[in-house]
């Protein structure tokens, strides 16, 4: 996905924004040529299976999927697991979709990409992956972001902010999502790269995993504070909820007064946390557009259009 890179000041804190390009935002995509006219001739049924619907980011993705269905004149059902660790629940949804033979295409954001690749190996159902790529020749296209690039951008900005905040020794610790998840691991790699390039040090051995849940991020932050009573310059997190949770956990400790807390997402809760002085900055991604373009890609494939491998 081509990205527009924007920067904006929010209550004195830098909010890095990497929004989906692909010819424009979802509002612009709605007017994308002949696609809608072609689609209204068919009553396509698209099943969308997301990682979860429990978090604000995934609700944005789901809303984009539904809007694409309305604009393109197709039926879209959006499903999601109860959490980002409910692996069996999502696999069951995918298996049911594959065996039910009641839809024309499937859009999926996999929790376990390798397992899903095996699961879809023998299907003829058109499949589009979103958010997290699936290494399978059954997947027609991937709609998403380069998570390493996003995190690297946040890492670089965090180091610059830490310098301005007066930190001499700039070290960073990550509170990340699900251990082994490709998105989480890519973001760790990106944060590490961006921080190093800007002159900081990412403490890889001290990475905490909190399953993308704010409450678990609080527990992770408490462990970091216990291990580093002197303070840490930067805390990077897999999403905004976790970054804000970590900041709340550290609020009572003077050594963490100037710590830079960085998340990824840019949802309303994240922006509110920045304005409230909790989270310092976020790398904002347009989940709505990811969902919209995922459904649009599925419809284009059903209409015989050859898709780009990476949208």
Where are these regions (language model features)?
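C-terminal motif of bacterial Sec signal peptides marking the signal peptidase cleavage site
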Residues: 17-21
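Hydrophobic alpha-helical membrane context
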Residues: 14-16, 63
């Amino acid at each position: 996905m081509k990205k527009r890179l924007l920067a904006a000041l929010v209550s004195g804190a830098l909010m890095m924004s990497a929004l989906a390009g692909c010819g424009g935002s979802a509002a612009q995509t709605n007017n994308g040529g002949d696609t809608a006219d072609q689609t209204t001739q068919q009553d396509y049924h698209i099943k969308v299976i997301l990682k979860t619907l429990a978090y604000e980011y995934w609700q944005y993705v789901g809303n984009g999927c539904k809007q694409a269905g309305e604009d393109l004149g197709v039926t879209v059902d959006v499903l999601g697991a109860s959490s980002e660790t409910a692996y069996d629940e999502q696999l069951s949804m995918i298996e049911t979709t594959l065996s039910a033979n009641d839809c024309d295409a499937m859009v999926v954001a996999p929790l376990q990409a390798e397992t899903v690749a095996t699961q879809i190996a023998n299907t003829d159902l058109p499949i589009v992956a979103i958010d997290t790529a699936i290494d399978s020749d059954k997947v027609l296209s991937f709609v998403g972001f380069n998570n390493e690039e996003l995190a690297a951008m946040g890492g670089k900005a965090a180091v610059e902010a830490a310098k301005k905040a007066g930190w001499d020794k700039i070290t960073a610790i990550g509170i990340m999502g699900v251990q082994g998840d490709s998105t989480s691991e890519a973001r760790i790699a990106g944060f590490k790269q961006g921080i190093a390039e800007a002159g900081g040090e990412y403490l890889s051995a001290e990475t905490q995993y909190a399953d993308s849940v704010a409450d678990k991020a609080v527990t992770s932050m408490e462990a970091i504070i216990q291990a580093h009573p002197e303070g840490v310059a930067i805390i990077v997190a897999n999403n905004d909820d976790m970054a804000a949770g970590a900041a709340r956990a550290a609020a009572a400790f003077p050594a963490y007064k100037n710590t830079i807390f960085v998340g990824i997402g840019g949802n309303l809760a994240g922006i509110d946390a920045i304005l409230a002085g909790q989270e310092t900055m976020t790398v904002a991604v347009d989940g709505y557009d990811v969902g919209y373009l995922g459904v649009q890609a599925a419809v284009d494939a059903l209409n015989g259009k050859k898709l780009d491998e990476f949208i």
